[in-house]
Amino acid sequence: AILIPGTLGDNPIFQMMVEGAQEAAAELGVSEPKVVEGGDDYAGYEKLFLSLAESKSYDLLITYTDSMVESVLKIAAMYPEQKIQLLDGDIIGIGQEVPSNVYSCRFKNEDLGYLGGCFAGLLTKSDLPYANEDLKVGLIFTDIYPAWTNYIQPAFENGAKSIDPQIEVVF
């Protein structure tokens, strides 16, 4: 079963996650995964995930993002026989050990941020129309989110400053 912390339309990665799980199920000859969308009820995600574990109906529970780390840790401890996969959730980054029944992987957001910063630095130093002569670049996030502020933001700044240490990054 897959718990989407949001809705499928919120993030293209959610759709890719579901399609990947469906493809894997087809290749393995097992049932298609149940997909549960958490919607906008952020406080209810853990309860939904817990209900999936309590049902003991699924070999594997899958969820996504740093917003689910604490819930995954709690439910993994309550149901040590339940296999859980946490995509793009940083358990180690919050100083916790990954439980034996959890597979956790994190996207290398710092690489994305660094390359984005390099690109912004190259643009601002260029002679392209509207390039900022003041060597100033900006980074805009749609929300404050740990993977973004802990990894992308500092890496973006490092990438921009690798082009020119005088570049100012505005966040």
PLM-predicted stretches and their roles:
Residues A1-F171:
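A residue-level marker of the well-folded mature domains of exported/periplasmic proteins
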